[in-house]
A protein has these predicted regions:
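Short amphipathic helix-loop junctions that connect adjacent transmembrane helices
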Residues: 49-90, 276-302
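Intracellular juxtamembrane helix-capping segments at the cytosolic ends
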Residues: 156-170
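Cytoplasmic loop-to-transmembrane helix junctions
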Residues: 32, 90-91, 172-182, 186
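A gly/Pro-rich, aromatic-decorated transmembrane alpha-helix motif that marks the paired
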Residues: 49, 107-108, 189-205
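Cytoplasmic membrane-interface "Motif A"-like loop-to-helix N-cap segments
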Residues: 115-127
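Central cavity-lining transmembrane alpha-helices of secondary-active solute carriers
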Residues: 92-111, 305-313
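C-terminal ends and interior cores of transmembrane alpha-helices
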Residues: 125-145
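Intracellular loop-helix junctions on the cytosolic face of multi-pass helical membrane proteins
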Residues: 1-29, 171-172, 181, 198-299, ...
Length: 313
């Protein structure tokens, strides 16, 4: 019987390009992947920092909510489960649905990349969909379409670009763990910057400016990714035979997978709390925090940047 590890190693070698030397002795492709992911996370968290505030203060107000195509159907579906909701409660429910679905779609994005497309093409499509979604958020009528594009875009982008980081290294390369630390640092910096820029523009200048900044960030991320394609793992065609072999796990690997699956409820519970930073916390903070800073009315979204900065330190 064909050895699964041999097949996987052979496939990895066949999808690898000469990487050159980037920073700290890592392949040059890592720089492009980290920068692309950083800009994607900037766009993602920029939009997310504004979503509940935008819904509460603008879109769900009586003079605007009727302009959002299809939202009446969504509202009826939500209130059929929860009962009648206030504006703030409905905004929280919409955010919760989005935040829950956005963590499920990467599973489908990985399947699409492995079965039909390849990681490079799937990441590219995801970035384009996310950029379109951010720009469409600027218009009331296209709110639900924008959310749908963002969900699909994140699903295509997020997991697949992280997988490409691993593809830059052999399985036993000691630099691999450090590469993911650098990758996470890029994400952390984006989480700090996004509310400061998109949040400030959205709250102080206009909602469409904040969402537009998120869209521009995603376009920069896409351009960065495409500029670095020559340094990334080569994108071979989808290979069904290798995909079949990849499912033949050893007993030890199956135990590891089961252990990871068992951890999912715990991780999910922690995310419920973490996501409240972008949901109830913002609404509560806006009402209860003293946001004056040296005579300047500080945007409430800056609280998210402060929290992210403290987490990094």
């Amino acid at each position: 019987m064909t050895d699964t590890r041999t097949v996987a190693d052979s496939e990895a070698r066949s999808h690898t390009r000469p990487q050159g030397t980037g920073i700290l002795g890592h392949p040059r492709g890592l720089v492009y992947l980290c920068a692309s992911e950083g800009w994607e996370r900037f766009s993602y968290f920029g939009m997310q920092s504004l979503l509940v505030l935008y819904l509460t203060h603008y879109l769900l107000q009586p003079e605007h909510v009727g302009k959002a195509v299809g939202f009446a159907v969504v509202r009826r579906a939500i209130e059929a489960v929860t009962g009648p909701l206030s504006t703030a409660a409905l905004a929280s429910q919409v955010f919760g649905l989005y935040a829950g679905l956005v963590y499920l779609t990467p599973l489908l994005g990985g399947l699409v990349a492995d079965r039909w497309l390849n990681r490079t093409l799937t990441v590219t499509v995801g970035a384009m969909l996310m950029a379109a979604g951010h720009f469409l958020m600027a218009f009331e009528a296209t709110f639900l379409l924008a959310i749908a594009l963002l969900l699909v875009g994140v699903g295509c982008f997020k997991g697949n670009i992280a997988s490409q980081v691993g593809q830059l290294y052999a399985a036993d390369d000691p630099r691999r763990a450090q590469a993911y630390q650098i990758f996470q640092l890029a994400i952390a910096l984006a989480v700090i910057a996004a509310p400061l820029i998109s949040g400030t523009l959205g709250e102080k200048v206009g909602w469409h400016w904040g969402f537009g900044a998120a869209g521009v960030g995603m376009l920069v991320g896409l351009a960065t990714y495409l500029a670095g394609r020559k340094w990334l793992p080569s994108a071979g065609p989808s290979d069904r035979a290798n995909a079949e072999n990849a499912r033949r796990l050893t007993r030890s690997e199956r135990r590891t997978v089961l252990a990871l699956v068992a951890l999912l409820p715990v991780l999910g519970a922690t995310q419920v709390g973490n996501q409240q930073m972008f949901n109830a916390f913002l609404v509560w903070g806006e009402a209860n925090f003293e946001l004056q800073l040296a005579g300047f009315a500080m945007p409430v979204t800056w609280l998210l940047s402060a929290d992210a900065a403290i987490a990094v330190v």
